[in-house]
Amino acid sequence: MIFYLHGFDATSPGNHEKMRQLQFIDPDVRLISYSTLHPKHDMQYLLKEVAKQMQHSDDPAPLMVGVGLGAYWAERIGFLNGLKSVLINPNLHPENTMQGKIDRPEEYADIANKCVSEFRMKNTHKAMCILSRFDEVLESQLSADELSRYYAIEWDETQPHKFPQLAAHLPKIKAFKLG
C-alpha cells in the first residue's frame, strides 16, 4: 500500500498521473487529500486517516509518498506511524514558503516545535528524498544539505517542482519500499 500526499496544488491533474505511475510499484495507491490551508487541522486529519487506512490493509510495509508540501507531511506522518516515506521536492519550511498563500503559516513552526526532538535522527534511513536539480519553486541544494545526514538523496536532472514523471525513479522507490 502506498499513501500519496499531494502538494499545495491539490487539484492538479498531475496528482492522478503520479498515483497511476506509483501503481507500477503497488496496485494499492491511496490518495489522502487534505486542505493545505489549515496546518494544525491537516496534521490531526492526516494522522487519523493514515491510522484508519492502515487498519484495512495487510501490507507489512506501507509507504508514504509526498510531493512538495505533501512531502513535508509524508516525512512527519510517516515518522509518527513508523512508516517509510519518499519525499519528492519537499517543502521543508512551509512556515516561510507559504507566507501569503495561507492564513496562518506560523502554525507550521508551532507543529515543528511540538514534534519529537531530533525526529530526523530517530528516522534515519526511513525516508528517501528525490530532488529536482532545477526546481523552479524551492532551493533543492538547501534541502539536500538539510536532509543528507539522515536520508539518501536522489537527484533528477529534468523534472520541475511538481515532478510529473516518476518513471525513472520507480525502481529505486520500489526497492526502498521492499528493503
Swiss-Prot record:
Name of the protein described by the UniProt record: UPF0227 protein SO_2251
Family named by the database record: Belongs to the UPF0227 family.
GO MF entries: hydrolase activity, acting on ester bonds
Superkingdom per UniProt: Bacteria
GO cellular component terms, A-Z: cytosol
InterPro entries: AB_hydrolase_fold (IPR029058), UPF0227 (IPR022987), UPF0227/Esterase_YqiA (IPR008886)
